[in-house]
């Protein structure tokens, strides 16, 4: 299935290459700099480097704040070897039991085709279920029996879909936000149940429990 999707994406996502300006005049400014220009840094693409510390945050596409097509042409040429993506449960499962990964595949499979790894964040919640958690920043975890059961099914579905494609996972974004209402006990239980599902499907999964915040 993933091979077919990747083939389709290679055809439908083709766009002319982005020209990265590395000339000495690439930055135009009225600021007077009393120094001699010694040279210009030329970015190296993903194919020219063995490793990179750069990670591009794509978390926001799940709530349609951004579009992968607007940035895709710059990622690999600038040497960005990994992207962080929020899976967007509420966007992938708008109707209970019906998963649509098309929008996420557009980003994930295209990135992999370019040699860019994906770090997948599973949050947020899904208001399609009573007690399914919020779908926004500082959202609360799924809390009801129905919501937690639906979350378990969601984790299983996305893990099965991206098995062999995504190894790096994160469970929830900023669960300790001041308005989230999440407790340490909830966070611990939630992390364990989610990690157990991921590892049952992807034994070599690398799992980060949470991305925390001071806000």
For each feature predicted by the language model, list its residue ranges:
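Threonine-centered tandem repeat motifs in low-complexity domains
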Residues: 7-8, 12-13, 20
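Substrate-binding cleft and catalytic face of glycoside hydrolase catalytic domains
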Residues: 75-215
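Sec-dependent signal peptide recognition
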Residues: 1-7
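Generic secretory/membrane-interface signal
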Residues: 15-16, 24, 115, 168
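Boundary/entry segment of secreted carbohydrate-active catalytic domains
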Residues: 17-81, 86
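Compositionally biased, proline/threonine/alanine/serine-rich low-complexity intrinsically disordered stretches
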Residues: 15-18, 147
């Amino acid at each position: 299935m993933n091979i077919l999707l990747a083939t389709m994406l290679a055809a439908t996502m083709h766009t002319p290459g982005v020209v990265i300006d590395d000339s000495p005049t690439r930055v135009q400014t009225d600021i007077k700099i009393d120094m001699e220009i010694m040279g210009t840094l030329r970015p190296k693409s993903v194919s020219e480097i063995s490793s990179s510390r750069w990670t591009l945050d794509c978390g926001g596409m799940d709530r349609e704040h951004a579009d992968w097509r607007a940035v895709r042409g710059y990622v690999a040429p600038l040497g960005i070897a990994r992207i962080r993506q929020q899976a967007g449960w509420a966007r992938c499962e708008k109707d209970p039991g019906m998963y649509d990964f098309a929008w996420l595949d557009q980003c994930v499979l295209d990135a992999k085709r370019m040699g860019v790894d994906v770090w997948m964040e599973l949050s947020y919640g899904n208001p399609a279920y009573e007690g399914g958690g919020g779908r926004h920043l500082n959202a609360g975890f799924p809390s009801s029996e129905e919501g937690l059961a639906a979350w378990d099914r969601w984790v299983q579905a996305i893990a099965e879909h991206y098995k062999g494609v995504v190894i790096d996972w994160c469970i929830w974004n900023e669960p300790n936000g001041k308005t989230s209402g999440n407790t340490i006990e909830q966070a611990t239980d939630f992390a364990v149940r989610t990690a157990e599902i991921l590892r049952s499907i992807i034994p070599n999964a690398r799992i980060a429990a949470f991305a925390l915040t001071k806000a």
